[in-house]
Structure formats: structure tokens, C-alpha cells
Design a protein with these regions (language model features):
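Membrane-interface interhelical linkers
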Residues: 1-23, 27-71, 77-90, 138-160, ...
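Hydrophobic/small/kink-forming positions within alpha-helical transmembrane segments
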Residues: 13-17, 45, 73-78, 103-108, ...
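Small-residue-mediated transmembrane helix hinge/kink sites in multi-pass secondary transporters
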Residues: 24, 84, 110-111, 176, ...
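Specific alpha-helical transmembrane segments that line the substrate/conduction pathway
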Residues: 71-76, 87-136, 188-197, 245-265
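Loop-to-transmembrane alpha-helix entry segments
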Residues: 99, 115-147, 157, 265-288
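Membrane-interface helix caps and helix-loop-helix hairpins in membrane proteins
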Residues: 115-119, 177-180, 241-242, 292-293
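Selected transmembrane alpha-helices and immediately adjacent juxtamembrane segments
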Residues: 153-186
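C-terminal appended segment following the main domain
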Residues: 229-293
């Protein structure tokens, strides 16, 4: 990875862990994110207005870009719904290590679909990142804790967490393809637009009046998370233009380091020795990815 892409992904990971932290504390329903992505479409309007790029980007958008953007947004919507359902059904220690295993799947799709060639150093680094995340999520070092998520493979939360991991890896590869075809800001705006429509339709099929209730209850939180989510996503898209998507997705798991720190400091989580061990392994993995070609 290039030094600039590493910096961008680290900043993105910090922002990502922050908005995830607020989301977990708030226990927001899926309808909350309709408003997040609606606000996301408005956040980019000043950039388009002052830069004057929007008409040109709109005219240059190919049918392939539109098609892949819609597919990516649908997959991201499925990812978001699956992740929220998983967190609603089970404890974090079961869902987190499975849902954050996306780097393992991403390298498979990246090799098969877009022909990325990964170095041995990079592959080992990705493996250590996943192991580090798994250990961070453990309650302790007993064998029962190690195999706890694996014993739940037939449970609905496991299924939704696995769906989140797979869909997260697929849309990341699609993002990589799309940002090679257009400006990252325009693509990010498209994703916000399409996901807003998709989540709006999903909400209407659930309860017709819930969107108004969600807006009335969480106005400030909606705007804050829209700002943080879009900043994090945009930085990753820019990094994808410079580096391999397999490395970017794996390096983004640095957010687990920040998340563990936030959990210990503000949520008073225990088992800091387990967290620190996982964080050390994760850090070694990140260093290897940073050195990988």
C-alpha cells in the first residue's frame, strides 16, 4: 500500500469505529439509516455546486457504472439489514468476529473477479488481521470462548453475521471497479441516493409511520452519523483508487483497535488482556499489509 492510502484508511477506520460506537449505543432501527442516507445525498450538493463537476460527471456516467452502482447499493442495503438483525439477536462476541471476516472473502473475489495478485506478505497480513479481530471479541482465552462463535453456526444471528461478511466483501470489490470509472464523490453520492430509495421502500413495507417517528426521535444523531459515515466511506473509496481492494478492506479493520479502546474507556468493558493480545496480532497484520506489494 502507498503511504497516502494507509493514512486515508487509518483516518477512515477511526471515523468508522466512531459512528459504529454511536450506533451501538443508540440501538437504532434499520429505518434510522433511511434518514442517514437521505442526508448523505444533500451533503455533497455544496461540492457539486462550487466545483461545477456534476453535469460532466452525470453525462460521462456509463450504463455499466449505473448498473454496478445499483447492484452495489442493493448489496450494501442487504449488508446493513443483516448486520443490524444480527446485533439485535445475539451478543457482540458472537456477531462481531464473523461479520468482520470480510477480508477473507474480499481477497477471493478480488482475485477471481478483477484479477488482483496478492503477495505472500499481504495474504499472511490479512490472515493475522482476521485472527486479531477474533481474539479482540473473545471474553477470555479459554477453549469455550474460542469455539463459542463456531458452535453457533446454525443460529439465525450467525447466518445474518455471515451474510454481512459476504455482502461486505462483494460490495467492496464493486466499489473498487466503480471508482476506477468515475469520481469517488459522484459514486458516493450515487450510493447514498440508491440506498435512501431502497431503505425507504423497505421501511414502507414494515410500518408506514415509523420513518416520521424515527426522524422525530433522533434528528441530531441522524445528521452526525450521516456526516461520519460518508466521510469514512469517501476516504476508503479514494484509497481504493491507489491500492488493492483486498489490502484496503483488511487495513480498514484497524477500526477494531479504536473500537476496543472506546469499549474499554467509555463502556467499561473488561478482559483488557484479551483485547490487548488481539490488538497486538491485528497490528502485526496491518504492518505486513502496509509493506505488501
Amino acid at each position: 500500500m502507498t503511504p497516502l492510502s494507509i493514512i486515508l484508511v487509518l483516518i477512515s477506520a477511526l471515523i468508522h469505529s466512531s459512528w459504529n460506537f454511536f450506533t451501538k449505543r443508540g440501538n437504532f432501527p434499520i429505518e434510522f439509516f433511511f434518514w442517514v442516507f437521505l442526508w448523505g445525498t444533500f451533503l455533497y450538493l455544496p461540492f457539486f455546486y462550487f466545483s461545477g463537476l456534476f453535469p460532466g460527471l452525470l453525462l460521462q456516467a456509463t450504463p455499466k457504472l449505473w448498473t454496478l452502482s445499483v447492484i452495489s447499493s442493493l448489496i450494501q442495503t442487504l449488508y446493513l439489514i443483516s448486520l443490524i438483525k444480527a446485533y439485535q439477536m445475539a451478543e457482540l462476541s458472537l456477531v462481531y468476529p464473523i461479520s468482520r471476516s470480510a477480508p477473507l472473502f474480499t481477497q477471493v473475489w478480488a482475485v477471481l473477479l478483477i484479477g488482483e495478485i496478492l503477495s505472500i506478505t499481504g495474504v499472511v497480513g490479512i490472515g493475522l488481521v482476521v485472527v486479531g479481530i477474533f481474539i479482540i471479541s473473545m471474553s477470555d482465552f479459554r477453549l469455550t470462548a474460542v469455539f463459542h462463535p463456531l458452535r453457533q453456526t446454525s443460529s439465525p444471528p450467525y447466518f445474518f453475521a455471515l451474510i454481512a461478511a459476504v455482502t461486505g466483501s462483494v460490495y467492496s470489490v464493486l466499489d473498487k471497479v466503480c471508482v476506477q470509472m468515475t469520481h469517488p464523490v459522484f459514486y458516493c453520492w450515487l450510493i447514498n441516493l440508491f440506498m435512501c430509495i431502497e431503505l425507504g421502500l423497505y421501511a414502507l413495507f414494515q410500518k408506514r409511520n415509523i420513518l416520521i417517528k424515527v426522524w422525530g426521535q433522533w434528528k441530531k444523531e441522524i445528521f452526525l452519523i450521516a456526516l461520519l459515515q460518508n466521510a469514512s466511506y469517501l476516504l476508503v473509496l479514494v484509497a481504493m483508487q491507489m491500492s488493492k481492494v483486498s489490502y484496503v478492506v483488511a487495513f480498514r479493520q484497524a477500526g477494531a483497535l479504536f473500537g476496543a479502546g472506546l469499549g474499554i474507556l467509555f463502556l467499561k468493558e473488561t478482559q483488557w488482556k484479551t483485547r490487548m493480545t488481539g490488538a497486538l496480532i491485528l497490528t502485526i497484520g496491518l504492518i505486513l499489509i502496509g509493506l505488501a506489494k
